[in-house]
Amino acid sequence: MTRAFNFSAGPATLPESVLRQAQEEMVEWNGVGASIVEISHRSADFMAVAAAAEADLRTLLSIPDDYAVLFTSGGATTIQALLPLNFAAPGQAVDYVVSGHWGKTAIKQATPYVDVRVAADGQPGGYVDIPPVASWTLSPHAAYVHITANETIHGVEFRDTPDVGTLPLFADFSSSIASEPLDIRRYGLIYAGAQKNLGPVGISVVIVRRELLERAGQPRADIFNYASHVARDSMLNTPPTWNWYLLGLTVKWMLEQGGVAAFAQRNAEKAALVYGAIDGSGGFYRNQVMPTVRSRMNIPFFLGDEQLDALFVSESKAAGLLALKGHKAVGGIRASLYNAMPVAGAQALVAFMHDFQQRHG
């Protein structure tokens, strides 16, 4: 069986070696006589899996001891709804910087609970740039400032951590976590759905400065209280054990591959290949994002018209290049180059782009 190159924005491609190991261990895991999906989450066997996943993630991301790590059910949208409940008083101001579609989604989830203030919004320019920090209108007593580190739809990425003074900086890193070195101490909290760089859909990671967990927040059930989850080692309720196990395998694979520094180099190489093909096409392929904020993970581009876009998608699929159709919100083409995408995948895409242009340009 030959695996195609999968450019899906999420759920995304996983390392083949991780999939092979999971396949081998699906029916009977580690000599226990049962599958990993069948054993109790409170058994010593699974507790060891969970502990190893956290330890490896701490090593991979250089997470300081004064930050707690949570493995939660669901995705980033759930987390976005829980942030104001846990870290802001009713009606308290929170600042949001909108650099694309998912920044708007974060605001939608927070609005029922707090006074959401838009500190900056890239929409007037079409989300092709991020407003400079000096232009942000920050509330002096905001509970936190929220950014989306990488926008998968518009292909816009924060290349540097913004300085928001003494305000806690919260960031959605769902699509760029572990893609390059990150100084977590610059943030009060970061979070990520796993299904792009960390593993399968259905589990997320929250990394939060412990002192922030002491905030009263708003009245909420225990299941929505991050402090309660920390106290119970992310096992306040039955967690998605299979997803947690796969996340652990993926994180271990990243460490074996050289860690974040190695992936940063590979990701830069992959992105340079694809952007080079776009910029060198004489306008046949177009990406309008400012070079200083171009995403390394998600590269949207457009051809002359929708018919040509559709032809590109169908022909690329026949060539073994999957899921290149752009998001419905913007159309066009989108290539997602997460950590598990090898350089060979970017090379294959670029070769196809050159061939397609020769035939249809």
From Swiss-Prot:
Its EC number is 2.6.1.52. The keyword Zinc-finger does not apply. Keywords: Amino-acid biosynthesis, Aminotransferase, Cytoplasm, Pyridoxal phosphate, Pyridoxine biosynthesis, Serine biosynthesis, Transferase. It is found in: Cytoplasm. The modification N6-(pyridoxal phosphate)lysine is found at residue 196. Disulfide bonds: none annotated. It catalyses: O-phospho-L-serine + 2-oxoglutarate = 3-phosphooxypyruvate + L-glutamate; 4-(phosphooxy)-L-threonine + 2-oxoglutarate = (R)-3-hydroxy-2-oxo-4-phosphooxybutanoate + L-glutamate. Pathway: Amino-acid biosynthesis; L-serine biosynthesis; L-serine from 3-phospho-D-glycerate: step 2/3; Cofactor biosynthesis; pyridoxine 5'-phosphate biosynthesis; pyridoxine 5'-phosphate from D-erythrose 4-phosphate: step 3/5. Binds 1 pyridoxal phosphate per subunit. Pyridoxal 5'-phosphate binds at residues 76-77, 102, 152, 172, 195, 237-238. NCBIfam families: PRK05355.1, serC_1. This is Phosphoserine aminotransferase. The lineage of its organism: Bacteria, Pseudomonadati, Pseudomonadota, Gammaproteobacteria, Lysobacterales. The gene is serC.
